[in-house]
Structures are given as C-alpha cells and as structure tokens.
Amino acid sequence: MNVGILHPGDMGVTVGLCLQRCGHEVSWLSRDRSEAPRARAEAFTDYDDLTTLCGQSDVIFSVCPPDAAYSVAQQVHQANFSGTFVDANAVAPSTAEKIAALFDDNYVDGGIIGPPARQPGSTRLYLCGERALSVAAMLEGADLQAIVMQGNTSAASALKMAYAAYTKGSSALLLAVNGLAEAAGVTETLQQEWQLSQPGLMQRSEKTALATSRKAWRFAGEMREIAKTFEAHGLPGQFHSGAAQLYELMASLKTLPPASLSEVVQVLLQASAEPTPDIESDSLRD
C-alpha cells in the first residue's frame, strides 16, 4: 500500500521504516522542513505538496507533536483525502474525537508507547476504530508491534494519556524537586537523605535530565492534553498543567546536546525568574 507519514521526526521515521520493511511504499511532505528531517526521511518518497501526497496515499499516519495534531488532520481533510487516517499522536480523547469527526469511519485512533521502534519488542502501537485491524495487518512482523484495542474510537488515546501521565509526569516532578532543592539551598542534604531512604533516585534524576532535556518542548503539549483528559473525567488536571509549564521552561534546550541534571536545574531556575514566553510548537519545521 501507499502510505504517507506526517511529519516524520525520530518516532515517525521509525514508523515509516517499519512500514517500508513490510513492503509498503512510504512518502512524506518535505515542504518547509529543515535539513535534519530531510536527512532522517531520505529513504522515503519526497512530496512538496500535501494535496499530491494525499492523492497518492491509501493510508496516512500522523506522527507529530500534540499541539499540531488537529491542525495536521484539518489540512489532510481539506486536501480531500479519502483513505484511512491514522492519528498516532499523544492527544486527549476529546482531541481524538474532534479528529475522528473529520474522517468518520476512515479514522483510526493510535497511541505509541515506547521509544522509536528500532528493535523488536521495544515499541507498541495501540489502535482502535473500524479499520484498526487492517492497519495492524500492515505492520505484521514489524519491529513496531500493532495491538488492536476494543472500546470507543478514542480508547488508544486514553491509554496513551494514562501511560504518559505517569512516565513523563513523574519525570517532570523529579526535575521540579531537584530545582526546588537547589533554589532552597538543600540539594546536598536531600541527596544524602535519598541515599539513605530512596537509593537510586539521584541516578534516576541524572538519567531523567539527559533523556528529557532535548524533548521537553514537545512534552509540554502532551502534558496539557493529559490535563484535559484528567479534567474530562472529573479528576484534577493541575499537576500535569504544572508539568507542562516546567517542560516549557526547558524549551531552550531543544537544539543543544543532552543536558546534565545541574544544567537542567540552572535552566529551570533562570527561566522561572524571567517572564514566561509564549511558546508555540515549531513541530512542522523540525
């Protein structure tokens, strides 16, 4: 089948490569993209026009930052795409339902759990919707394991929100705790107490800083979607709204090498002392 990928970052590229290895023709939209994504997507057919890409594609996978998910879906809808639209983004079920309304039965809800799919068993793509089984069949034997869920049209998004609420939410909390300790002048004593009562937490803090520093700008939108999900079910969403704010403070680390814990803490404290900028997703250019 002919598959379009919008817009392949680290995760989207591996989704495309998995589909390609399963025998599908994969294309992407190169318009307005920088050299880095062009290099990542060099194995795919390059289109400069979305309408042309949509006309050539049987299936489109949307794999982009959450802030851009609905906009990308609207653009595909406006290009009169008539095939299967797979939204594999980290969005709230309410956002997924809005996207589903654009495509009716041609919509498949997806949620990716795990790192970029470069080895078997590492990454799952949960799917639900009328065409979920046919999409899963496209990835049979791939490093990206497709799992079809029962439930409503946004069940995969709900699962992703619940999963990331802990993984990325707890990462934000841990970084915030380290920032608080530094600001209050108790870092050394806190670390000593951790060695006594929470062994391994210092090492986890260091690993969390390295793993999140370059991706924090992207996580901010995901935290806002998670907050919406909690609130939609009558649960407090303020924790994840706070996590979004913390990740936004780290946005300046996006283009730098992975940062150490001390570097992240200094960025947090410096950024928190300045007026908060109006950060918009630059997802379709990176």
PLM ranges: what are they?
Residues G23, A43, Q56-S57, S82, ...:
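Short, well-ordered alpha-helix to beta-strand connector turns
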Residues L50-Y107:
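Rossmann-fold NAD(P) dinucleotide-binding segment
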